[in-house]
Curated annotation (Swiss-Prot):
It comes from the Eukaryota. WD repeats lie at residues 9-48, 66-105, 114-155, 218-259, 268-311, 315-352. PANTHER family: WD REPEAT-CONTAINING PROTEIN 55. InterPro entries: WD40/YVTN_repeat-like_dom_sf, WD40_repeat_dom_sf, WDR55_POC1. Residues 384-397 have a biased composition (Basic residues). Residues 170-183 have a biased composition (Low complexity). Residues 369-378 have a biased composition (Acidic residues). It is found in: Nucleus, Nucleolus. Keywords: Nucleus, Repeat, WD repeat. The gene is JIP5. It comes from Ajellomyces capsulatus (strain NAm1 / WU24). One of its GO terms (cellular component) is nucleolus. The keyword Repeat applies. Belongs to the WD repeat WDR55 family. This is WD repeat-containing protein JIP5.
Length: 413
């Protein structure tokens, strides 16, 4: 279904990946705390740097040591002008997507009441609107920040905080705005955490929490345009679990799952389904979900017939940490210390010489120097412990606290 056309080595393990909504830009957040943005070739042969087969040069737009610990999550703003990053150091930073220059810092609320309380590491970040971001954490909190409120030299409190889960929030998916919405932005969000899903209204709080599903729920994506009939509205939430099974949830019936699709079948349980992404309508037939697994494979599941129709391998050792599609419809997969770009496979009448020429045309691009001249950290060069994926296994004990206090911080200088 897809052919790999280039591979991009990274300096350390990938923890987060974000794809620009309108430009061929990919941002990565690394275990070292670095954030780096790449410009990939245009998907057509009319743009600068493109070649006849869609290949060209991958350039580093900017690179910096953004966080003093691992970068846990990334997200572009609605208009793509801002890149938000959140790190295990307890900071959220907003930077210009084009240059990487930071223009806003926010402290993630800590656990406890003292000045030395534990950091509550972030897990997922999303831009709700140009003025608002939503951030989830390891403790199961959901923080809403209004960026129009100028940050204080002392603290920046979230405008609202909800607690949809007792375990860490593993995914965060918006529900489509209602037909009566005047803003056009999502007000209700579905989260997965531990063994449940929850629906939270950002104005009214947690609306509903599902029954215990007896397995860890890892990832989610919302799909519209499915066949409606009977009680089905043609809209479903697709959730990836830790045992290789996708569950489908009917909109409005959030107490329990509606259907199950076995994606990875193994005698002792399948691989964890780490990340889900919906294929663009221009690719394939019907609604197809790309499923990134913990074993480095990406499987493609067609909804309706509810079966796996294709598979590619990103890496044979490291799991998938990032997966999505750029403005040109190319799939971008990330995991371990490599990012790969994939084009939709094209059926060819001939083989042999032409196919061999195409294989030789595929290139491996190596990024530039690790030297970072645009470091916004005051403790540059501090040695970081290399950390593996942030995923926790079901049943691991966690310290819980209801206290939501904000870490004080100085100005942007």
């Amino acid at each position: 279904m897809f052919d790999n056309v280039c591979s991009l080595p990274l300096s350390s393990d990938l923890f987060a990946q974000a794809i620009h909504p309108t430009e061929p830009l990919v941002a990565v957040g690394l275990s070292s705390g670095h954030v780096q943005t790449f410009r990939i070739p245009p998907s057509s042969d009319s743009g600068p740097g493109a070649t006849k087969n869609g290949l060209g040069h991958i350039d580093t737009a900017w690179r910096t040591r953004r966080h003093k610990a691992s970068c846990r999550c990334l997200g572009f703003g609605i208009d793509g002008q801002t890149l938000y990053s959140a790190g295990a150091d307890g900071w959220v930073k907003a930077a210009k997507a084009e240059t990487g220059v930071v223009n806003l810092k926010i402290a993630v609320p800590r656990l406890g009441e003292g000045t030395h309380d534990r950091i509550d590491p972030p897990t997922v970040i999303h831009a709700i609107s140009p003025e608002t971001i939503i951030l989830s954490t390891d403790s199961g909190a959901l923080h809403l920040f209004d960026l129009r409120v100028p940050p204080s030299p002392v603290s920046q409190r979230p405008q609202q905080t909800h607690h949809p889960h007792d375990d860490y929030v593993s995914s965060l998916t918006p529900l489509p705005p209602s037909e009566t919405s005047t803003s056009g932005f999502s007000k209700q969000w579905v989260t997965t955490g531990g063994t449940t899903i929850a629906v939270t209204d950002l104005r009214r709080g947690v609306l509903v929490r599902s029954e215990d599903q007896d397995e860890e729920l890892i990832s989610s994506v919302y799909v519209t345009g499915l066949k409606a009939g009977g009680t089905s509205r043609g809209e479903k939430l697709v959730v990836g679990g830790a045992s290789g099974v996708l569950t489908l949830w009917e909109k409005g019936a959030w107490d329990d799952q509606d259907e199950r699709i076995i994606v990875d079948r193994q005698p002792d349980g399948g691989e964890s389904l780490e990340i889900l992404s919906l294929l663009p309508d221009s690719i394939g037939a019907g609604k197809v979900v790309a499923v990134g697994q913990s074993d480095g494979a990406v499987q493609f599941v067609q909804l309706g017939v509810n079966k796996v129709i294709s598979k590619v391998v990103h890496d044979e050792l490291e799991g998938i940490a990032g997966l999505g599609f750029d403005v040109g419809g190319r799939m971008i997969s990330g995991g371990g210390s490599i990012v790969k770009v994939w084009h939709e496979a094209v059926e060819r009448e001939g083989h042999g010489e032409n196919e061999e020429d195409e294989q030789h045309s595929r290139k491996r691009f190596v990024m530039g120097s690790d030297d970072d001249g645009n470091d916004d950290s005051s403790v540059d060069g501090q040695k970081q412990n290399k950390k593996k994926r942030k995923k926790r296994k079901k049943g691991k004990s966690k310290d819980k606290s209801d206290g939501q206090h904000v870490m004080a911080f100085k100005g942007l200088d």
